[in-house]
A protein has these predicted regions:
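A short N-terminal helical cap/helix-turn-helix that marks the beginning
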Residues: 6-22, 41-63
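Active-site diphosphate/adenylate-binding microenvironment
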Residues: 20-42, 108
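Conserved AMP-binding/adenylate-forming core of the ANL superfamily
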Residues: 62-117, 134-139
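Conserved residues at the C-terminal ends of beta-strands
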Residues: 65, 153, 184
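Phosphate-binding active sites in nucleotide-utilizing proteins
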Residues: 106, 128, 149
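Conserved ATP-dependent adenylate/AMP-binding module captured primarily in the ANL superfamily
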Residues: 116, 133-176
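Structured binding elements
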Residues: 123
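Conserved small/polar residues in nucleotide/adenosyl-binding loops
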Residues: 182-188
Length: 188
């Protein structure tokens, strides 16, 4: 390709990327493969804003299925935008700000997608573990990133049966609190 920068600028423009600050240039024309080049230098954008920007309010944005054949949930762009805005507002009201970590101990559901997009919308770092992780595995992940908020499910559908998830969640929270209350080796 002779004009790499022009090509990628055309892709950016054609895709309608929403950015609060435009890039000074897409990429240097003669950028080497290694070390990797800087792309779209100076651009500032939000992933969630770009995901939610497209689609008419009445169009289906998400089709979520479970292992039950008759359990399919459809969510429109309008509903998704509204739910993400509400969840984002709730996160902000809890003091979540850019750079804070928000976690999920839940499955791949529409509700979890809403939580992820809301966290992204406020600029938070997102991490998640599936509900089949045991408490030790969740604590190993979460104590490293120290989430300020954890989204979780209260029950899990597995092999046709609903399983309570609250016990594992409570054990995780207790383990995190024990880890997070430790502040110093200094004596009082």
């Amino acid at each position: 390709m002779d004009e790499v920068g022009k090509f990628w600028q055309a892709v950016w423009d054609e895709m309608g990327v929403v950015a609060s600050e435009k890039a000074s240039h897409p990429v240097a024309e003669n950028a080497p493969m290694f070390p990797p080049a800087e792309w779209f230098v100076g651009a500032r954008l939000n992933f969630a804003e770009n995901i939610l920007h497209f689609g008419k309010d009445e169009d289906v944005a998400v089709i979520a299925c479970t292992e039950r054949e008759d359990d399919t949930q459809r969510t429109t762009y309008g509903d998704l935008r509204k739910q993400v805005a509400q969840a984002g507002h709730a996160l902000r009201s809890l003091g979540i700000k850019p750079g804070d970590t928000v976690a999920s101990y839940s499955g791949n559901t529409c509700e979890n997608l809403v939580a992820f997009l809301a966290a992204s919308a406020v600029g938070a770092v997102w991490t998640s573990v599936p509900p089949d992780f045991g408490t030790a595995g969740v604590l190993e992940r979460f104590t490293t990133v120290r989430p300020r908020v954890i989204f979780s499910t209260n029950q899990v559908l597995y092999n046709g049966k609903l399983h309570d998830h609250i016990g594992k969640l409570n054990a995780t929270i207790e383990g995190l609190l024990a880890c997070l209350l430790y502040t110093s080796d200094a004596a009082d």
